[in-house]
């Protein structure tokens, strides 16, 4: 099994600011890391896959980086609509693993 540890658990920033979320894997997962955004009552939305590739239709304000065991999601020029919980995700041997989530609170 792969354990994904996200930090921080919660972060607050103002509109126009920048937020950085880290995800640490318990073993080398190369670049097999995705980031999802989830809002209450909605399914998760894929933002980034293969660590740094932006999913179709996703704003370039979202940037993923890292490889191996250390990964980062950066959200710049924050908007109120970015308020959500963000999860990192990977897979191994047909199993899917998620981080514990990071709640992003946007002050506007």
Swiss-Prot record:
Q: Where is this region: Framework-1?
A: 1-23
Q: Per the record, which residues fall in region Framework-3?
A: 57-88
**Source organism, top-level taxon:** Eukaryota
Gene3D superfamilies with a match to the protein in the record = Immunoglobulins
Q: Which residue ranges does the record annotate as region Framework-2?
A: 35-49
Q: Which keywords describe this protein according to UniProt?
A: Adaptive immunity, Immunity, Immunoglobulin
Q: What SMART domains does the record point to? A: IG (SM00409), IGv (SM00406)
Cellular component GO terms, alphabetical:
immunoglobulin complex
Q: Where is this region: Framework-4?
A: 98-107
GO BP, sorted A to Z: adaptive immune response
Q: Where is this region: Complementarity-determining-1?
A: 24-34
Complementarity-determining-2: where is this region?
50-56
Give the residue ranges for region: Complementarity-determining-3.
89-97
Q: What else is known?
A: Residues 109-139 of the constant region are identical with the corresponding residues of rabbit 4135 kappa chain. This chain was obtained from antibody to type III pneumococci and was isolated from the serum of a single rabbit.
PANTHER family in the record = IMMUNOGLOBULIN LIGHT CHAIN (PTHR23267)
Could you tell me what this protein is called? Answer: Ig kappa chain V region K-25
């Amino acid at each position: 099994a792969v354990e994904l540890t996200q930090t921080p658990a919660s972060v607050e920033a103002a509109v126009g600011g920048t937020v950085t979320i880290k995800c640490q894997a318990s073993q080398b997962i190369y670049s097999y890391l995705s980031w999802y955004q989830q809002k209450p009552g909605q399914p998760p939305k894929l933002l980034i896959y293969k660590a740094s590739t932006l999913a179709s239709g996703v704003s370039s304000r979202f940037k993923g980086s890292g490889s191996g065991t250390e990964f980062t999601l950066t959200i710049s020029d924050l908007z109120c609509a970015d308020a959500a919980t963000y999860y990192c995700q990977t897979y191994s041997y047909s199993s899917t693993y998620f981080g514990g989530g990071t709640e992003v609170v946007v002050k506007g």
